[in-house]
Amino acid sequence: MAELALASERDKERDRLAKGGFVRSLNFFDIVTPHSVDEAIHVLDHWRRRDPGGSVELTFNSPGGVVIEGFALYDAIQRLRRGGSNVTTRGTGACMSMGAILLQAGDERIMDKNAMLMIHEVSAQFEGKTSTLMDYMGLLTKWQGRALDILSERSTMSRDEIQNKWQRKDWFLESDEALELGFVDRVE
């Protein structure tokens, strides 16, 4: 019960700030998990309903995490954008794996000077019978295709160029490299 009262107070404060022309901001400094994504989507959906079209800044410092949960958060950010919100995404610290994909979700993508981006092939852990694992491989291939689509659409690189860079390794980029390749629009 106390959690609901606290959440209600936070919602009221967010509404008060939004009416004053403030940008709504959310810091996602966590692993991408069902719980962390659920909390973030709850906030974003609340903002979308209460103040359609309001400006939003999302700051990411994430080592990545669960692929499908990351895509759910990416889609929630796209709903905000389609609803007229101007969404700025910022990378600070480390935006790795799915964290790098989430950074791509904004209208404007900013990276802090000392931040790091890490991009790699989609990875997952599965166990089971051979036929089940083969089904999972098909799913991983689809998820990897989606990640490549997002990264190539938001950068100056083609799918093939990205695949060649990340094949069988983690690909680390400093902020100036990320800017040069179009993974961000600005470095601060």
Task: Please tell me what each predicted stretch does.
Residues 1-188:
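N-terminal organellar transit peptides
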